């Protein structure tokens, strides 16, 4: 029997303005598209923060004294035979809003892309070199198109 819901999602909002943050079921929809092959129940925590908190977290964990759009903290902690804590996604609302304008994407599309990108990191994907980056971007493009959003990356056809 197929499991109906393969994620347990908690969301913390730690920013003054919570307007235009997607609803929990929307986050779940995006994450499920990334985790569609996973059989376990996967626990993910999302924390939505302001630029100051993001800057502090980025400095503490990556040594970078600036805010960023998303940080992923992979745990992949086996809780029991049916549950895995995949990790945490920390998103900066203000930067996502700025980037949606900068890249001329809808705000919803930018949120979707960041959640997909972060969830792929929780699964072990990365973009530290050209080969990894190409693989990850191809998956992100495919999922975004499947969800009826524009490609976040415009890739040259090979």
Curated annotation (Swiss-Prot):
Belongs to the endoribonuclease YbeY family. Zn(2+) binds at residues 117, 121, 127. Single strand-specific metallo-endoribonuclease involved in late-stage 70S ribosome quality control and in maturation of the 3' terminus of the 16S rRNA. Its main location: cytoplasm. PROSITE patterns: UPF0054. Binds 1 zinc ion. Its EC number is 3.1.-.-. One of its GO terms (biological process) is rRNA processing. Pfam families: YbeY. Keywords: Cytoplasm, Endonuclease, Hydrolase, Metal-binding, Nuclease, Ribosome biogenesis, rRNA processing, Zinc. InterPro entries: MetalPrtase_cat_dom_sf_prd (IPR023091), YbeY (IPR002036), YbeY_CS (IPR020549). GO terms for molecular function: metalloendopeptidase activity; RNA endonuclease activity; zinc ion binding. It is found in: Cytoplasm. This is Endoribonuclease YbeY. GO terms for cellular component: cytoplasm. It is an enzyme of class 3 (hydrolase). Its cofactor is Zn(2+). SUPFAM superfamilies: Metalloproteases ('zincins'), catalytic domain (SSF55486).
